[in-house]
Amino acid sequence: MQITRLNIERVRNLKAVALSGLQPFNIFYGANGSGKTSILEAVHLLATGRSFRTHMPKHYIQQNAQDAIIFAQSLSEKIGMQKLLSGEQLIKVNGDTVATQGQLAKLLPLQHLDPQSTDIIDHGAKPRRQLLDWLMFHVEPEFYFAWQYYSRALKQRNMLLKTKRQLSLAELEPWNKMLSEYGEMLHSQRLVTVERWKDFFQQDLAQLLPDLQIELEYSPGFHSEVGLWQDLLNYHNKDVERRYTEYGPHRADLRLKTALGDADDVLSRGQKKLLMMALKLSQIAMLHASNKETVVLLDDLTAELDSNAQRRLIERLSQLGSQVFITTLDHQAVTQHLDGLSISYQLYNVDHGQVHAV
């Protein structure tokens, strides 16, 4: 979905924002605190139902307001969200109310590229698992269904483990069966997807870090050689003792291996940032190969990447057909790259919450 029109109301310090004629690349510049990042935050809210800055709606909904509204339109779709202080939300697609955020997310695949962040590499398995599941959601039609059933079974099993200190295998058997069935399904889907992803990853890695060999390895979160059912039986007593489910796809990881060891241990901060870019760009490329285009949020592009890296990133995103929303303090550096690559763009000045096309 390529956004042609964007309306934002009551998000942080932004005045009512009404943008039309959006281009493949849209650059928002202005002083720190002017509201640039809040525009990206609003688009992120619309696509995912979450802010990338806070979990608390009261922090991004304007003071004394009860809600925030974000609306976007493409040539063929109209999507909108009303987010309430309570965290509840109302979602509409082409005027019809829809039940789940997933329906909206399917229409608006979105990646947030933060050049200052190395969380995917440094902060344990969870952000890497979330990265993998973003890809799964968009390329594997049955993933969301399997994940929903697996998550419900896991929640029920963990509740039992927490409420009873003594549990027999028979008491857990219904949940073990459900976990095993849908967990193995998730594992099979992830295994196939990661194998496909590896080729895309190596292509983007070669462009951004040509002197490094890094392998992407999938760890399923359980002993796949014996199967999840057997793990649940073998570790029954330990699960009862710990009062949670130790093994399963909810503990999966993506391991990034170099010849010298794990990437988080041996790479410099600059290399980690480029590795993070390669991971996300390769996912965007994989969607592009399936005729799905990704909206990309690029916050503070010029702050952490040198000029060559900026140009390579912009060129690659253009090749992948992405619509890109960029914030920067140095718009001249960004427009110089875009002009040099003959890429269409629109420039916006953001000043004290007011957004004006330049």
UniProtKB/Swiss-Prot annotation:
This protein's record includes keyword Coiled coil: no
The subcellular localization recorded is: Cytoplasm
Position of the signal peptide: none
Record-level GO cellular component terms: cytoplasm
Q: Is Cytoplasm one of the keywords?
A: yes
The entry marks the following residues as binding ATP, namely G30, A31, N32, G33, S34, G35, K36, T37
Sorted alphabetically, the Gene Ontology BP terms of this entry are: DNA replication; DNA synthesis involved in DNA repair; double-strand break repair; SOS response
- Which GO molecular function annotation, any one, does this entry have? ATP binding
Regarding protein family, the annotation reads: Belongs to the RecF family.
> Sorted alphabetically, which PANTHER family does this protein's record hold?
DNA REPLICATION AND REPAIR PROTEIN RECF
- Name the UniProt record assigns to this protein: DNA replication and repair protein RecF
Q: What organism does the record attribute this protein to?
A: Acinetobacter baylyi (strain ATCC 33305 / BD413 / ADP1)
Q: Which gene encodes it?
A: recF
